Amino acid sequence: MAELNSPLILGGLHLKNRVVMAPLTRSRATDERVPTAMMAEYYAQRASAGLIISEAVVISEQANGYLNTPGLFTDAQVEGWKQVTQAVHDQGSLIVAQLWHVGRVSHPDLLNGAAPVSASAVQQKGQVSLLRPKRDYVAPRPLEISEIHAITEQYRQAAVRAKEAGFDGVELHAANGYLLDQFLQSSTNLREDEYGGSTENRARFLLQAVDALIEVWGAGRVGVH
């Protein structure tokens, strides 16, 4: 059996050991979703791991559902991430960016008054995290096919920006009830077009997003959660 501290080849990544840090949202970015010096320090403190998967990173203004989570859709955000990736690399570790769109798990107060979007108009239960006074989630607006294609392109653009920011790869967040998972689940995907119905159709958005990331990074540096 290999020892925990022994090197590991994981796809196209060469890890110094077999310890991988899971993504953990900290909400320490600026109001403009720019990574901060505190974030660079936080990740550097954990860079004894062979690989760090970053906290979830929103791919657009529409993609967010929480306060002060970082993004990868502006030049300022790219510059902010550079201090993080450099701090991790200085410790001999690797870091990949987890790309994120929350879909219906948001609120108009976080989206400049716009409705959140999803596969179908199925409302998220409960109340929005950390907003005060407390607010219930609202029914999302179903995405048009052209908008699905546009979001796929936003995933690709975020992957390009991740490379510019010094990341070593990307991971697609497709779980935990967020947008891609909303398309995968028959309880939240009631569509009757090419993105709904069969398992193949419900997985179409996810697989197209994966292809978009591979176009930028190659298959060896793309993961799916």
Task: Walk through the language-model features, giving the residues of each.
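Catalytic domains of carbohydrate-active enzymes, especially glycoside hydrolases
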Residues: 39-60, 165-169
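Alpha-helix-loop-beta-strand connector modules within alpha/beta enzyme cores
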Residues: 69-96, 187-221
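Non-globular sequence segments
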Residues: 86, 100-161, 165
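Conserved, mostly hydrophobic/aromatic
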Residues: 21, 46, 88, 97, ...
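Structural preference for beta-strand elements that scaffold enzyme active sites
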Residues: 18-20, 51-53, 94-96, 169-171, ...
